[in-house]
């Protein structure tokens, strides 16, 4: 039964169980603190994992959109979105610190492979945790673009409308595809608030939610700073409050070894789905890697249009570190940093709760070497498990996308199809959309191949050699594909394929057009794309066929392989 906002239990397990910023140790201290402590960038020392504060950016706001799926996840009545209480919540205004005091998380991170030091929530404030009374699921509610915090570094604490629209829509798109993700609850315009980026841009606030916002970077900072007790409290909090549901820590090792194995498992499951749907985060630093395996912090993200495994949507990623091809290995690299942070806790094995031994370990070169050796051995095994999960889950989903039984003999059909797409620079989303809406049994192989080519020709629409050779390659593939699917009934196979092959993909050119319209005060296209991103498998969304086909299938050279900056 759906509830009103006031009926949802409010909590803050994060601040109740973890060490605070030493300069703001309590809510009472926050009430008395100078603005320079709360909203001016500084280093937080002493193992503090958060700072109590309230959003500093105050402005009149306008609700642009809310997410029906997120409202449902919270167990709210949809009518609640029209109330003043909801619209104040999603911009972080009218906060009751005595009921639950907001906070900003402290974390660090490796960015493009280099240690970046303290990062943290530089423009994000966590307001509280809300629990769905029916499901018992707890969500930490954040507002992004809420003003400066101690973690803002050189930034202004604002989020521009452009990046806010991108994050909101990406959350909706990935959630609808079944890819583990943080969720957007709402997006609101801020009246009269602007920020200087490449140009002066209007600002917005995205209200977002997740069971936890802890990242590998949260562990990195405590490990680098040698804050072992803070690290232990963080790990125990994750084990007791964050990772309990669906825990896959295995049967070997102490609880911290199991934590590492579980985080690797969750991220492997997510990476497999990224690869199957061609999603790229664009900036997979350790501070953008969730311990829950959630896709998180959407900046220069993108979906593959042309199937180019070397593509990165981040134009600052000149060495292709975060390209589509490299994502599985980059997550392994990030997991290795989590293992490094936990090395003493994992390497202590069954003596991890013997505080006298832990003191000896911390100060003994020989014991530390043994701890490193053991942790390295554990990590090697976890990496093998991770790789197997990524590969198996990737093929399981790809089998569904092409409508084939999960049989190892069919893998060659998938690899050959992807190779054709790569060789002739063809469009991946359009290819799978065509396959799920057209049966090869309905026409001759060559005719089917020609129509498939026409659906996904992209960078070389007028190149006769590419057209002819790709049709020839497709004709050969379609013959084998027809043979593999001939025992299945067409209508049921296509119906199943349509459930996993989106009709609409959130391409970067679509986002550019949405943002261009929004920046002149027109939000009609934004609202249409909201609907399409949230329900990508539909045959129609009630708009004109011409407009829907344009948004779903347009794949001209100028609209393909668009890169973005990290500016937000």
UniProtKB/Swiss-Prot annotation:
InterPro entries: SelO. Its cofactor is Mg(2+). Pfam families: SelO (PF02696). GO terms for biological process: cellular oxidant detoxification. The active site is at 287 (proton acceptor). GO terms for molecular function: AMPylase activity; ATP binding; metal ion binding. The lineage of its organism: Eukaryota, Fungi, Dikarya, Ascomycota, Taphrinomycotina. The keyword Transit peptide applies. Catalyzes the transfer of adenosine 5'-monophosphate (AMP) to Tyr residues of target mitochondrial proteins (AMPylation). Involved in redox homeostasis by regulating the cellular response to oxidative stress. Regulates protein S-glutathionylation levels possibly by AMPylation of deglutathionylation enzymes such as glutaredoxins. This is Protein adenylyltransferase SelO, mitochondrial. HAMAP family: YdiU_SelO (MF_00692). ATP binds at residues 120, 122-123, 144, 156-157, 208, 215, 297. Belongs to the SELO family. It is found in: Mitochondrion. Mg(2+) binds at residues 288, 297. Keywords: ATP-binding, Disulfide bond, Magnesium, Metal-binding, Mitochondrion, Nucleotide-binding, Nucleotidyltransferase, Transferase, Transit peptide.
């Amino acid at each position: 039964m759906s509830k009103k906002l006031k009926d949802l239990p409010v909590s803050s397990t994060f601040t109740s169980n973890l060490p605070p910023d030493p300069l703001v140790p309590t809510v009472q201290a926050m009430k008395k603190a100078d603005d320079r402590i709360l909203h001016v960038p500084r280093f937080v020392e002493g193992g503090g994992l958060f700072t109590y504060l309230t959003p500093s950016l105050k402005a009149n706001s306008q609700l642009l959109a809310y997410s029906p799926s997120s409202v449902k996840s919270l167990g709210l009545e949809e009518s609640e979105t029209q109330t003043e209480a909801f619209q104040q919540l999603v911009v972080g205004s009218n906060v009751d610190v005595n009921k639950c005091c907001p906070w900003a998380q402290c974390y660090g991170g490796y960015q493009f492979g280099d240690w970046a030091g303290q990062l943290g929530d530089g423009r994000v404030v966590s307001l509280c945790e809300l629990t769905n009374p029916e499901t018992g699921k707890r969500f930490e509610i954040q507002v992004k673009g809420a003003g400066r915090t101690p973690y803002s570094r050189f930034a202004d604490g604002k989020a521009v409308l452009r990046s806010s629209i991108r994050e909101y829509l990406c959350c909706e798109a990935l959630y609808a595809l079944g890819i583990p993700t943080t969720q957007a609850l709402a997006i609101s315009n801020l009246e009269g608030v602007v920020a200087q980026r490449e140009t002066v841009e209007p600002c917005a606030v995205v209200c977002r939610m997740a069971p936890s916002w802890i990242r590998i970077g949260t562990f990195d900072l405590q490990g680098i700073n040698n804050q072992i007790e803070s690290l232990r409290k963080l790990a125990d909090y994750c084990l007791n409050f964050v990772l309990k549901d669906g825990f896959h820590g295995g049967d070997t090792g102490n609880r911290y070894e199991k934590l590492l194995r579980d985080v690797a498992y969750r991220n492997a499951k997510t990476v497999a789905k990224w690869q199957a749907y061609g999603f790229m985060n664009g900036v997979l630093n350790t501070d953008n890697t969730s311990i829950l395996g959630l896709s998180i912090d959407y900046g220069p993200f993108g979906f593959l249009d042309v199937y180019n495994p070397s593509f990165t949507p981040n134009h600052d990623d000149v060495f292709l570190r975060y390209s589509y091809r490299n994502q599985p290995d980059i997550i392994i690299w990030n997991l290795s940093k989590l293992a490094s942070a936990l090395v003493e806790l994992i390497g202590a094995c069954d003596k991890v709760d013997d505080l006298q031994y832990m003191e000896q370990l911390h100060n003994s070169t020989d014991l530390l070497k043994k701890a490193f050796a053991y942790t390295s051995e554990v990590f090697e095994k976890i990496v093998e498990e991770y790789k197997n999960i990524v590969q198996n889950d990737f093929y399981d989903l790809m089998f569904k996308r092409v409508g084939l039984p999960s049989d190892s003999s069919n893998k060659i059909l998938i690899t050959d199809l992807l190779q054709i797409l790569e060789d002739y620079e063809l469009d991946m989303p359009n290819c799978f959309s065509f396959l799920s809406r057209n049966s090869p049994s309905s026409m001759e192989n060559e005719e089917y191949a020609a129509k498939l080519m026409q659906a996904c020709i992209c960078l070389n629409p007028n190149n006769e050699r590419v057209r002819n050779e790709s049709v020839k390659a497709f004709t050969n593939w379609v013959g084998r594909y027809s043979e593999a699917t001939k025992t299945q009934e067409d209508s049921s196979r296509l119906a199943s394929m349509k459930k996993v092959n989106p009709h609409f993909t959130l391409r970067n050119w679509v986002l550019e057009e949405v943002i261009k319209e929004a920046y002149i005060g027109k939000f009609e296209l934004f609202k249409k794309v909201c609907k399409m991103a949230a329900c990508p498998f539909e045959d129609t969304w009630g708009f004109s066929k011409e407009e829907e086909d344009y948004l779903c299938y347009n794949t001209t050279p100028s609209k393909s392989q668009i890169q973005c900056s990290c500016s937000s």
